[in-house]
Amino acid sequence: MYGISLIGTGESIRPAKAKEPEVKDLKEAYKTIEADHFAPRMEISFINGDKRDTLSYEKVTWNIGGEEKGLRYGENPGQEAALYKLVNGNLVLGEVEMLGSNQPLASIPELLQSGKHPGKTNVTDADNALNILRYLTDKPCAVIVKHNNPCGVATGSTLAEAYFRVNKADRLAAFGGCIALNRDCDMETAKLIVENYAEVVVAPDFAPGVMDVFATKKNLRVFRIKNMARLTDFVAKHVIDFKSLIDGGIVAQTSFSANARKPEDLIPAYCNRKITDKATGAVTYEEHKIKRLPTAKEYEDLVFGWLVEAGVTSNSVLYVKDGATVGIGTGEQDRVGVAEIARDKAYTKHADWISWEKYQKPYNDLRLAFGEEDGAKKQAEIMEQTRAEKGGLPGCAMVSDAFFPFRDGAEVGIREGITSIVQPGGAIRDWDVIDCCNDAGVAMVFTGQRSFRH
């Protein structure tokens, strides 16, 4: 049985004295840099009898204004925080080899422009963007993350096109987000980025002149992570994922890695339905299998969507089309509800984009910009177009991080015109969902792997 010892070396950890800010002080609280008391080094040891495997860490700081500083604060002002990089330790648990200390990514980002001092959420948002981008290296790709979930993910023939498409996917949520790019940021992409408000930009490197463009945004944090050029090295590697409990306990697990990364990894949906004769108790099995296989284009979107799913909080359902997210539903407790939320978000974002293209105004601002009567008329016209186009959902692939227990979840997407579904499979009523798809002419594939994320 493994035991875990957590050893801080150097200065001991002393919690800061709690202070209740007055309302007038709240704005200042967001500007305050917490002086953390975390030790400069940390070790975590896995002990099994006489065997001890130790992971060694060092605290990360940046030179900001001539001073060495760590994280601004944790998730909220008043929470001390520290970022540690792994400097030593090659751990093997069973047959699973953990990622070694010579391949850092988000734990040692090079801060090229500090803007506002980086905080914990800036680093974790960048990390989850990399968690998605590690699977999507074949084409230029952009991810925008906020609150540890993607606002959008999109590929393109160029990096600028990928950024344009990801911003279009959810222009509203992208405001103040963390933008991560899987190619060196060029001038065209940089000029598009500064047209909007972003908190963080992360890329392998930046072309000459790009930092001058970013300098016009004084609060923008710009991180260079050179190892992003080797993102494929991180696809099948694992790390130890620690979760602290409220009583100080720790849950340790190996990190998730998506197994279905290409079309041939996806399984055409099938199952054997168990039927028990009520009179005799005799058991027979009835085969159910999907009638239509995905097209080549659908396979591309199914794989893309499943890999994006690895970075979305559960329960989640996504709609994707042509290598871009259309609607993302996150963090819900029922699968039908999250499918509906993703659908509703697709409609909302579609309407907002129509408004932006026509009037250079957000949909919600049309009444302010054009007056109550004219603005309401414009909104009604946009909503009529959005409904006619079903929020851009026809032809989408529907992605679910866990199986559909009943057909009702799949039916949410089918009513909007989705043409393919990817999900883990394994529900007792898989047969019902398969029949539902066959009735609608929808292709469905299984991954054989759940993709929960909490």
Regions found by a protein language model. Name each.
Residues 187-191, 343, 407-415:
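Amphipathic, non-transmembrane alpha-helical secondary structure
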Residues 128, 338, 410:
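Thiamine diphosphate
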Residues 1-212, 216-280, 285, 298-307, ...:
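Active-site loops and adjacent core secondary-structure elements that bind or stabilize anionic groups
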Residues 151-171, 318, 326-406:
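Glycine- and Gly-Pro-enriched alpha-helical subdomains that act as flexible
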Residues 196-231, 254, 392-454:
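C-terminal binding/interaction regions
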Residues 311, 348-352, 415:
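Conserved helix-loop functional segments at active or binding sites
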Residues 293-295:
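Active-site/ligand-binding-proximal alpha/beta "capping" segment
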